[in-house]
Amino acid sequence: MAKRGGPRTVGVPWRFHLTPGIFMNSLVNVADNSGAKVVKVIGVVGHYSKNVHRRIPGVSVGDMVVVSVQEGKPEMRKQILRAIVVRQRRPFRRPDGTWVAFEDNAVVIVTEEGQVKGTEVHGPVAMEAAQRWPQVASIATMII
């Protein structure tokens, strides 16, 4: 029997499935110099959970999330922003069979169009995030 419905994510180009490592209400570090230090994940861009009751959306490297700034400069605190996940602690498997895990969970603050707000990224950036978001790759110092 053929599968009904469209692709898994509507409007987002297909990508290799990664193990989710960051969920709602997770506190994550900010890896750029935008002024925020710690943010809380409050939403996932492109996730619609009305079909599955009580499902908590999870994100992995390269996904865009909605965050609330918890720690940082006074003018940045309590703002609702968008961010891209560039590192996750949970191990995920790449198509070549290697497993990758980072020391912390980290995001990069971006605008709604995907333009990076900072001018540099501290620490490594996952290759999956760099391939999906070229603006992040252009300011990254290390891509793993």
UniProtKB/Swiss-Prot annotation:
Keywords: Ribonucleoprotein, Ribosomal protein, RNA-binding, rRNA-binding
SMART domains listed in its UniProt record: Ribosomal_L14 (SM01374)
InterPro entries, sorted: Ribosomal_uL14, Ribosomal_uL14_arc, Ribosomal_uL14_CS, Ribosomal_uL14_sf
GO molecular function: large ribosomal subunit rRNA binding; structural constituent of ribosome
Taxonomy, superkingdom: Archaea
GO cellular component: cytosolic large ribosomal subunit
GO annotation, biological process: translation
Signal peptide (residue range): none
Record function comment: Binds to 23S rRNA. Forms part of two intersubunit bridges in the 70S ribosome.
PANTHER family: 50S/60S RIBOSOMAL PROTEIN L14/L23, LARGE RIBOSOMAL SUBUNIT PROTEIN UL14
Assembly behavior: Part of the 50S ribosomal subunit. Forms a cluster with proteins L3 and L24e, part of which may contact the 16S rRNA in 2 intersubunit bridges.
Family, similarity comment: Belongs to the universal ribosomal protein uL14 family.
Protein name (database record): Large ribosomal subunit protein uL14
